[in-house]
């Protein structure tokens, strides 16, 4: 299903209310679906949607322990962010997404699910949770870890230390030669060392 078109359809039917700026952005994106400059592929977004809804669970009350079922707008933004590609190069059109959401509307939970999807679906990448302060950067990092621990399938393949979340268990002596080397780390403006990261996904909060 094309969730971008379905989202626009629900807005036009009056079932969903959006602001003027978002409405204009959606109109442009819908027109770009037929623009020969771009190719739209639903599969990359669908892959991440399937991962989140299969393996991720809520960790906060009142939904603690319940499966994370994405809303229509969340599915739409994942398809758009990963689905639009340049027709000539096949590179992704969008490398940055600005997400403006009011407090207590699930922003951290949503981003944590995306980070876990990238962690498991990519290889050898650094996923960084960043903010102005270490305390703020730690909020997303801990939500990712809580979501990881809530899933037996994810937890048994990974571990956490004071520096990062990584593949492999602490007491497992099995060779890491063929193991996924991806890591999830946290970083703030207060961090002394900001170099040496191969950042595939950078989530910047409260900037």
Regions found by a protein language model. Give the residues of each.
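Phosphate/NTP-binding elements of NTP-utilizing enzymes
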Residues: 1-207
């Amino acid at each position: 299903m094309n969730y971008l078109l379905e989202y626009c359809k629900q807005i036009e039917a009056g079932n969903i209310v959006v602001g003027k700026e978002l409405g204009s952005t959606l109109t442009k994106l819908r027109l770009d679906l037929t623009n020969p400059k771009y190719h739209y592929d639903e599969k990359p977004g669908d892959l991440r949607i399937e991962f989140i809804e299969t393996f991720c669970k809520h960790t906060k009350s009142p939904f603690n322990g319940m499966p994370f079922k994405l809303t229509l707008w969340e599915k739409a933004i994942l398809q758009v962010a990963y689905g639009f590609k340049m027709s000539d190069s096949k590179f992704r059109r969008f490398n940055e997404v600005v997400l403006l959401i009011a407090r207590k509307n699930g922003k951290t939970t949503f981003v944590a699910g995306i980070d876990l999807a990238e962690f498991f679906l990519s290889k050898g990448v650094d996923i960084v949770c960043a903010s102005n302060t270490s305390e703020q950067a730690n909020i997303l990092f801990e939500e990712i870890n809580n979501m990881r621990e809530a899933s037996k399938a994810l937890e048994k393949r990974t571990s956490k230390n004071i520096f990062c979340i990584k593949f492999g268990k602490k007491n497992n002596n099995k060779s890491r030669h063929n193991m996924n080397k991806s890591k999830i780390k946290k970083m703030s403006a207060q961090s002394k060392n900001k170099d040496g990261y191969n950042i595939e996904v950078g989530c910047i909060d409260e900037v």
